[in-house]
């Protein structure tokens, strides 16, 4: 199958894993500065806070999205740093905009029904990273402009879970056409994987791409604190967000 290439800057080659470097300097708070980042939305009673992939908790002092319907999810957040640490939080921030990322659990292994339910349609894998206990995946796929919602899933490769750290990314296009390529983001909650007991292991993700079957290895520790890293910033791209589930 032909993959219709797109020319969206080709991810620029100079970008970091999920996009541009920071515009925000923690030592110089200014309302005209901002950063765009993938974070976890954490409900806290009648409100919420944001948790970065380095473990920092951010308190939204102000927001341009007062009607945001929050839940435990991953999200792309454009924010401006307003203050240094406050009790219980690393920084106070202003949310300029926030957009939820499709956030899913690992789906069950269905044996002979894997292909019919989860699909075998190829994708182009653009980026993959683990942060705050989630696998964030940026990918591209062909679409037929029919309005059909595609399904993306992360599934085990063994019925008996004998190899729990090898998973498969699946794409079900439901027979949609191939008029154009679009990209999207999805995050998978990895909390159902076995405890690594403090060890860092290889997490292997198998993917059917337009160039054939490929495997990607990432370092994984079930304790998010052992995986803390400086968060990757991203360019918002919702081409596919309304067409996948």
Language-model region placement:
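Generic preference for well-ordered secondary structure
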Residues: 7, 23-25, 123, 172
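N-terminal hydrophobic alpha-helix used for membrane targeting or insertion
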Residues: 10-13, 170-172
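Bacterial N-terminal signal peptides that target proteins for export
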Residues: 1-9
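First exposed extracellular module after export/assembly in secreted or surface-exposed proteins
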Residues: 32-245
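Bacterial Sec-dependent N-terminal signal peptides
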Residues: 3, 15-41
């Amino acid at each position: 199958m032909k993959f219709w290439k797109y020319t969206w800057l080709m991810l620029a080659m100079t970008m970091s894993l999920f996009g541009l470097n920071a515009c925000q300097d923690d030592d110089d708070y200014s309302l005209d500065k901002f950063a765009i980042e993938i974070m976890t939305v954490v409900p806290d009673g009648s409100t919420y806070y944001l948790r970065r992939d380095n473990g920092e908790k951010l308190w939204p002092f102000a927001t341009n999205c007062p009607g945001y319907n929050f839940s435990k999810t991953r999200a792309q957040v454009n924010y401006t740093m307003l203050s240094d640490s406050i009790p219980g939080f690393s920084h106070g921030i202003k949310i300029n905009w926030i957009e939820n990322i499709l956030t899913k659990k690992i789906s069950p292994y269905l044996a002979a029904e894997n292909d019919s339910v989860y699909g075998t349609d190829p994708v182009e894998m653009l980026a993959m990273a683990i942060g705050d206990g989630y696998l964030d995946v940026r990918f591209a796929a062909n679409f037929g402009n029919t309005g059909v919602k595609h399904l993306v899933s992360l599934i085990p490769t063994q019925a008996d879970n004998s190899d729990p750290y090898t998973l498969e990314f699946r794409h079900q296009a439901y027979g949609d056409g191939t008029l154009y390529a679009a990209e999207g983001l999805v995050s998978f909650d990895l909390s159902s994987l076995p405890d690594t007991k403090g060890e860092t292991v290889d997490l292997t993700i198998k993917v059917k791409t337009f160039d054939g079957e490929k495997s990607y290895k990432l370092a994984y520790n079930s304790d998010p604190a052992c995986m803390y890293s400086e968060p990757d910033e991203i360019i918002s791209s919702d081409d596919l967000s309304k067409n996948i589930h």
